[in-house]
């Protein structure tokens, strides 16, 4: 069976690359399908001119892989980081359509099924959705071929001006599954249908399977450390550094452009940094998801500096696995490293079976 994946393709975002790989891995490795991600021109490219973006990709692929240190000093951390993302992403078969906003209807003849998701493909706040909702609702494909896999809205409600777009788009799917309880409520309100809430695809892979695609970071992981990863403009972590150093921990902060070894880390290094951390502090959904995969203590921070409330994404994840007390404002310092995974591991097995049943049902219908 030949399957096309349609999702956000972002070569700067860990969670995006990892969820894309997970969907590919599940369908290809476990079900034997031929799978390819179908992408229009890359979101968040260095330049809107497609030929320049293409040139940067070629340069990063060949030059930075040969002499990464020179490339980093000469051309900056951003291109090295982007190169690491591109190189890691080679393991995800992807067909890029440069200069096209819409996927061609001709693809409908080439694939048996199309999977939309995972990630926030239906978040109307995102420029990618406003430009590519045609693709994320799979409007180029026959309705019977449309499958949504752990789709996320990233919001709790749809404003009136977007309702028709969502109703028309969602009603055309043959199967819909969502990632958050809020998404389930949105579909119920718009379509009157009950759809399953599934875990993010990254949680379908074991820690051992993720370590197979990990990479050794350029920082020392042999000493105890706390890993910080914040996507918001600011995080309420003013006390965590003091606590860490008082207790003998190094502090590693991803996205800190003052530390090239961390800032330029790709998805493979991201996996290793989480797997070896003593404690993870983050406002990122996927960072917390990987903390759970590796049974690591973690602290969840509110994401600041955003125009939208994204807490629904984390609420479902935390409530489902019994970690709703892991928000920073609910924890005392003596609870930072205490994180009981006995019930969470049992719940993960239940959720993985639900996910498997959904995929099996979809594929059997074909």
Task: Identify the function of each model-found stretch.
Residues 1-366:
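Active-site anion-handling motifs in enzyme catalytic cores
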């Amino acid at each position: 069976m030949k399957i096309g994946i349609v999702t956000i393709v972002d070569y700067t975002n860990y969670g995006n690359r990892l969820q894309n790989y997970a969907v590919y891995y599940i369908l290809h490795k476990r079900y034997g399908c031929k799978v390819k991600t179908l992408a229009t021109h890359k979101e968040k490219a260095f330049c809107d001119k497609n030929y320049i973006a293409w040139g940067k990709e070629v340069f990063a692929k060949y030059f930075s892989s040969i002499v990464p240190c020179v490339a980093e000093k000469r051309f900056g951390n951003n291109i090295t980081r982007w190169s690491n993302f591109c190189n890691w992403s080679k393991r995800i078969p992807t067909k890029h359509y440069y200069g096209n906003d819409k996927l061609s209807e001709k693809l409908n003849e080439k694939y048996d099924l199309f999977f939309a998701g995972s990630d926030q493909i239906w978040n109307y706040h995102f420029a990618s959705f406003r430009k590519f909702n045609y693709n994320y609702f799979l409007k180029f494909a026959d309705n019977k071929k449309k499958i949504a896999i752990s789709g996320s809205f990233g919001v709790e409600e749809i404003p009136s001006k977007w309702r028709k777009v969502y109703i028309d788009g969602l009603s055309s799917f043959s199967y819909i599954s969502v990632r958050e309880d809020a998404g389930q409520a949105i579909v119920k309100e718009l379509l009157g249908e009950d759809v399953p809430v599934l875990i993010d695809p990254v949680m379908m892979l074991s820690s051992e399977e993720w370590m197979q695609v990990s990479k050794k970071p350029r920082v020392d992981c042999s000493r105890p450390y706390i890993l910080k990863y914040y996507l918001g403009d600011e995080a309420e972590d003013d006390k965590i550094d003091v606590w860490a150093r008082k207790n003998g921990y190094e502090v590693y902060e991803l996205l800190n452009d003052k530390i090239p070894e961390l800032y330029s880390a790709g998805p493979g290094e991201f996996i290793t940094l989480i797997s070896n951390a003593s404690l993870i502090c983050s406002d990122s959904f996927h960072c917390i998801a990987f903390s759970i995969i590796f049974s690591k203590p973690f602290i969840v921070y509110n994401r600041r500096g955003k125009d939208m409330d994204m807490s629904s994404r984390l609420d479902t994840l935390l409530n489902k696995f019994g970690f709703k007390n892991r928000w920073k404002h609910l924890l005392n310092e003596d609870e930072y490293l205490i994180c009981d995974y006995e019930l969470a591991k049992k719940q993960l097995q239940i959720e993985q079976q639900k996910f498997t049943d959904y995929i099996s049902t979809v594929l059997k219908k074909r």
